[in-house]
Curated annotation (Swiss-Prot):
Membrane-topology annotation of the record: Single-pass type I membrane protein
Residues bearing carbohydrate: N73, N406, N684
Name the UniProt record assigns to this protein: Receptor-type tyrosine-protein phosphatase U
Catalysed reactions, as listed in the record: O-phospho-L-tyrosyl-[protein] + H2O = L-tyrosyl-[protein] + phosphate
EC numbers: 3.1.3.48
Signal sequence interval, chain numbering: 1-16
GO terms under cellular component: anchoring junction; membrane; plasma membrane
Organism: Danio rerio
GO molecular function, one term: protein tyrosine phosphatase activity
Domain MAM residues, every copy: 24-184
Compartment(s): Cell junction; Cell membrane
EC class name: hydrolase
Residue spans crossing the bilayer: 749-769
Amino acid sequence: MNTCAFLLILAVQIHADSVEGPTAGCTFDEDSDPSLCEFSQGEEDDFDWQLFRAHASPHSTSDLLRGSYMMVNSSQHAAGQRAQLLLQTLSENDTHCVQFSYFLYSRDGHSPGALRVYVRVNGGPLGIPVWNVSGSRGRQWHQVELAVSTFWPNEYQILLEATVDRKGYIAVDDILLLNYPCYKAPHFSRLGDVEVNAGQNATFQCVAAGRPSEAEKFLLERHNGEVSSGGSVKHLGRNRFAVSFQLEDVQKPEQDLYRCVTQSSRGSGVSNFAELIVKVPPSPIAPPQLLRAGSTYLIIQLNTNSILGDGPIIRREIEYRASLAPWSEILGVNMVTYKLWHLDPDTEYHISVLLTRPGEGGTGPPGPPLISRTKCAEPMRALRGLRASEIQSRQLTLQWEVPAFNLTRCHTYSVSLCYRYTTAGGGGGHNTTVRECLAVEHNTSRFTLRDLPPFHTIQIRLALANTEGKKEGKEVMFQTEEDIPGGIAPESLTFTPLEDMIFLKWEEPVEPNGLITQYEISYQSIESSDPGINVPGPRRTVSKLKNETYHMFSNLHPGTTYLISVRARTAKGFGQTALTEITTNISAPTFDYGDMPSPLSETENTITVLLRPAQGRGAPVSTYQVVVEEEAGRKVKRELGIQDCFPIPTSHGEAQARGAPHYYTAELPPSSLSEATPFTVGDNHTYNGYWNSPLDPRKNYLVYFQAMSNFRGETRINCIRIARKAACKDHQRALEVTQRSEEMGLILGVCAGGLVVLILLLGAIIIIIKKGRDYYSYSYYPRKPGNMNKTPITYRQEKSNMMGSMERSFTDQSTLQEDERMALSFMDTHTCSTRSDPRSSMNESSSLLGGSPRRQCGRKGSPYHTGQLHPAVRVADLLQHINQMKTAEGYGFKQEYESFFDGWDINKKKDKTKGRHDTLMGYDRHRVKLHPLLGDPNSDYINANYIDGYHRSNHFIATQGPKQETVYDFWRMVWQENCFSIVMITKLVEVGRVKCCKYWPDESEMYGDIKITLLKTETLAEYTVRTFALERRGYSAKHEVCQFHFTSWPEHGVPYHATGLLAFIRRVKTSTPLDAGPVVVHCSVGAGRTGCYIVLDVMLDMAECEGVVDIYNCVKTLCSRRINMIQTEEQYIFIHDAILEACLCGETAIPVNEFALAYKEMLRVDSQSNSSQLREEFQTLNSVTPHLDVEECSIALLPRNREKNRSMDVLPPDRALAFLVTTEGESNNYINAALMDSFHRPAAFIVTPHPLPGTTSDFWRLVFDYGCTSVVMLNQLNQSNSAWPCVQYWPEPGLQQYGPMQVEFLSMSADEDIITRLFRVKNVTRLQEGQLVVCQFQFLRWSAYRDVPDSKKAFLNLLASVQKWQRECGEGRTVVHCLNGGGRSGTYCASNILMEMIQYQNIVDVFYAVKTLRNAKPNMVETLEQYRFCYELVLEYLDCLEVR
């Protein structure tokens, strides 16, 4: 056969007879149809296959078989050369088999080469040989089957390749395509694509029909020719098995086409190519975005629009961790935003987003992290453990607990050590309080305070602050040790020098530095004008007792200067010395006369005496005088001694002219009397200008010798009578008669004058007593005995009051407006006096309203009644008066209020830019005038007016709330008027409008030249107290000012009840010092609320001191000072109701240190009334508790809400309702729950009945919506006295959904008193709101049929446990429930309020605590037993504190 080309694979032929056999093939015979057999030689090989026909070949040998076939003679080619034979491309639809025969033969038995079969699919690479054979197989044909499982539309092509090795022959023949399965080679079922995520294992499972031989090889071939072996075989049946190939940890580059291949000597099975699809798990390209950060949360946006990797995304998760933490947490997210809860404050977090696609391992790597930090949170509490490790006289070394992060809750924090001490003012001045705050180094718990005063009580407080808040600890007192005292102030040394004595007085050292034990005084003479004194003299020392701050020096020398030193001593030693020089006075000269000397001689006109020289004392004698005195009418006091001397020089002629009884008869120099010398009196000579006239023989004479010393302007005289000359008898008798006449006239004149004075004095006393009785004896209303201390009014006080009234009566009434005249009359009537007036004190225990014990009531002035249309009202008649005014048809509150506006006008409107309202400008006469600023004469204006208080003129300043441009003026006024208290009765913003600008700093700020520093803030439920320190440039003094900010006045109208406002007024009164300046009161415009406050303050004092109230005339008076002080009729009525409440309730607060005795007295049963004070107080509470009308509970009474109420008798008022926020289908927002205030926080409690089966979902909505972190359960489940059963409303254990709320049980602990359960609550409809951790406290010690708990200690344990949890979780609200949400819940809330009262204000006020709760819901604390339990619980609590 010479045919060059044959059809190897024939077209498919369909036989009509359906006889099984080859559908196509190549037998290479001569008679075969060449059009049906087609093959081609390879182009990438070394030589071609040859068609061999044995009968026609010239090279035929005995080694070759007979017949026609394709052959390779390896002896003609070099080893390694290849020849390829390509068969026709096939595309089959059904199972088929390719069969061919081959032989390999070499005469020497060696391998002629190898025969390999390849199956190429869709023109792709050859891949590996699916079948191959080598070696000499004998001189015979062998049959092979190929089971190729590649079907249309795919196509495949078979390639036969012969590789030469040694001499021999390789031949193929009878290549047939059979339309039935192969018998020897297994057929693979269709191999499906495999999709995996990168990094996962991929498994190809090749299912085949047939029976594999033991020598069968199973391969997984990659499209590029790589081969994997080691497949596991599993027999599925008799003629069916599966081979599994696992590719481990596949990655994206391994994505390719793969097929299964079986190999044996009998043939090969080849599957179709299946694709291994490797998907890369997705990962975000960008980090998440931070939307908002808080102290314990971060709100982020996932930001997953752009990703790396493959989708689809079926799950999104957040992975977060603290930057330095080894842990991380992953949370599932189903929204584009998410709120991370319960984070640590001031902590940096790494937050990444994880995306997941379908399949195992579909979660991609975390995306780029968002690195964000939470904000700081307010410190958990103040630092504790403050103690002194070392105490010295001038320094303290202090230690305290280390400020750990769980306390600071911020890495950036500051520890301030604030201390204060009081030093006594020098010179009798006021005490000065030194305050200073020092910053402590970071991360230290030790500090040394230096430069402290010795032996002083130092009060120290630690303050822990960060950017979000500040926590101050309690003050701890330390006392420094003693030191040597400071010096006695030289200016405090006062002395009185005498001739031989000095009286010295001094003050205690300004800095005693301890307890003074003694004073030491030293003195020494250092100079003297007496030449006979030796100076300096010896130094002498005297010790004085600690309480002796004076000394009398005696036995000193006259005219001598002494150096005196004084110093104090403490246990530490002597202090500095105070020095002074004091000179004693010179003394009069002394004479050396024994008895009166006898005259040397005597004539009718002369007498001769012996003059002896005098001795100077402290100064020498400067001159001598001889003095003659007529004896007529003069009695001799003593025969010899010092007489009244004669310092005024008088000559004889001058004495005659003036009628003087004595004259100088001679003046002698000291030099003339160096020794005793005779001298004749009356010798008619002149001595130094003085005529020694002869003596009159008719008169008696006394002769005196006088010596005089002069030194530095100081003169001392001494004289002595040295002689007496008698007159003639006749002249003496005449003189005596004249003298007696003169004496009798003098006596009669004195008696007459004394009688006149006595008559006038008695008349004045009678008039004053009569007027005093008329003025004070009249009392229009009876007084309750014992209400006031009756202080007697002295004559001086009466006279002062009378004169004041007289002076006012002469005031020019024409200059006053009608309202002002009325106001003056009102103030006169109620004895309004100035601050400096003397006032009587009030006995606190007997006061009518329990006001401040420091209130001075003065006299009991009569009410304003005489001829008046609006008289004062007795307190006892006030309730009846108010009821009449509210129900009156002709004349009531409306008409009375409108009468205030008759004839009002404003004549002066100035400085409108500084006024908040044009029509509310203050009257200029009572306007506060500021000290003008330099260069600005108009800067004296501020919209503020003085208002009189009760018994205190200008006690208040009513002003508008400061605007931005008037803040400096406001603080100028506070400084100028020395104000201590500022009362603010407005919020900064109300109804969307700015009512008052924030005129105070958060820390410290300058307003002009005034520096305001916030010292501390105390926040209560209804008001806030801020304490400021004021300093002004150019002034050394510091002022302390307290702002009392009432925050509970509603934006519209007046408060529903006056309880909180009355407590607020009492707090301001007790906190304001008596010597402070006016109380500044402001709201927004300085009227309305301001007027209400002032009227209440004045009327409370009047009611207490006089037993009456004069509201109408008080309001009229206020309006004369500042216009429109009461703006609405509603405010006017509120004042009456508030005064009534104050009078009915009184003051019920008890200091902690007096509580035990007070409560014992309250329990004492009065023998007459057979009732105790405690019972009467509870009855009063019931009488003032408001009763709810149907209109006040309109929402609870709606038909759709009736089924949500456990009892229709216990409904919450509309004003206190806690409306639900979370929606649930068609359910409304009502739940039977009321908001209640605690002592420190408004709406801190939510009181509700035990949930009904149909309101459990509402209960959990309430807990979540209001951020309630605690639930207090005071009843037990399934109580038999309940109208409906008390069901369990929580899951235990596990997780349960109540409407939109999912509640997950976390843990439980229990003891004999309390079961504590922890839950996690979240809203599944709004997962972005995060989750809430709630702790439930189920109290077990309250029996079903008892009004009070079984154990007070157990109840205190409950209160402490809840309080501790609330501190740890950030002060969320507390839900309190019992069976009906009344008595038990009220007892718990009242007890909580009382504990806070004791902790922060050291007072107990059970009445106030319960009344505050009842103002919101009347059934709080229902029984007397529960009310008494509150008292006894306080007693138990105080006992526990003492034990600690």
